[in-house]
Amino acid sequence: MSALLEVSGVSVSFDGFKALTNLSFSIDRAELRAVIGPNGAGKTTFMDVVTGKTKPDEGRVLWGEPPVSLLAKSESKIAMAGVGRKFQRPTVFEDQTVQDNLMMALKKARSPLAVLLFKPETPDFARVEELADVIGLGAVLSRKSGELSHGQKQWLEIGMLLAQEPKLLLV
C-alpha cells in the first residue's frame, strides 16, 4: 500500500439506517480531498470511522506504511499516529490565552507527568508564534480564547491541530 489512508468496503448502520454502504477510497501523502454531500450523506460518519469514534459493521481502514488497521485502535492512539480532526463546533480552552492553547497543543510527550512538568523553551514560543501567524491570530496571542469571535475560535482550533503535526487532517 502506498496510500497514507486506505478505506475499503466500509459499511455502517445505526438502528437499521445505513449511514455508509461499501465506502472505498484512498488518500495519498500531500493529497487534498473534498467530501461533500447533503445532511445525512455520511460525511461525519466517515470521519468518525477514520478517527475511531465509530466502529464499522464491515470493511477495513488501513493507515501508514507498513499498513496498520485503525479499527482496533482507540481515538487517542489514532490521534497520536497522526490523524487530526476538526469538529464543527470549536473546542478551545476559553479561560486560557491563544498562546496557552497553542502551547498546550504542541507535539510533545503526553504522559500525565510530562504534561505537569512541561516548561516551554525558546523553540516552543517560536513555533507558537509561527502557528499564530499562519492562522491569522498573531496579534491576539495574549487574549483569552473565550474573547475571540466564533471564526477566530475555529482558526485557533485549526492551529491547535497543526501544532500536533498531523499526517492527515480531517476538516
For each predicted feature, which ranges?
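Helix-to-loop junction immediately C-terminal to a conserved catalytic motif
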Residues: 51
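Conserved ABC ATPase "signature" region
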Residues: 115-140
